[in-house]
């Protein structure tokens, strides 16, 4: 009888040395799964899967143990490194993940609002989506669209320094001082990705995607 395995794996680009660490539940360690992150998928498409190697770092008997280890390994410092593909902090073991594995639940969430839909119907759909994280594919499409736009348009906040009062306002809004992780986004320096996200009115994950993207040289971590 097959037994579910809860794995922490690492994928390495043998050309540039960049790595991706993820969590995966499977009955077969050799199922060919190569991650779901936006950046790693883009890189595999660019370099070819033959230029990547995968190794199992840990194997657990429960998802709780797996996600706990992922949280320890894939922390904020890790995702901000220039040699990693991870854009999201690890440790996502929560009930939402379980629900999203149910096809009927996913279909229900993907219902698009149609013209003439009643207010009550819209309310029910909104309620169903509350607290549910968007898929990597959805986020990737939004990020791609935004990036394409700013290839031909100047971001209104590009190269605009942050005043002391603005820094203070952002810090207060984000709940105080954040861990020091110096980065530069579109000509503006920040002490933490959260500050950059607030300044550019995007999510922290989008900031990490910008930093890890090969086609955005003006977004990087300051060493």
From Swiss-Prot:
GIY-YIG domain location: 4-87
Molecular function in Gene Ontology: endonuclease activity
EC number: 3.1.-.-
SMART domains: GIYc (SM00465)
PROSITE patterns attached to this UniProt entry: GIY_YIG
Protein task: Probably involved in the movement of the endonuclease-encoding DNA.
Name assigned to this protein: Putative endonuclease segD
Source organism of this protein record: Enterobacteria phage T4
Gene field: segD
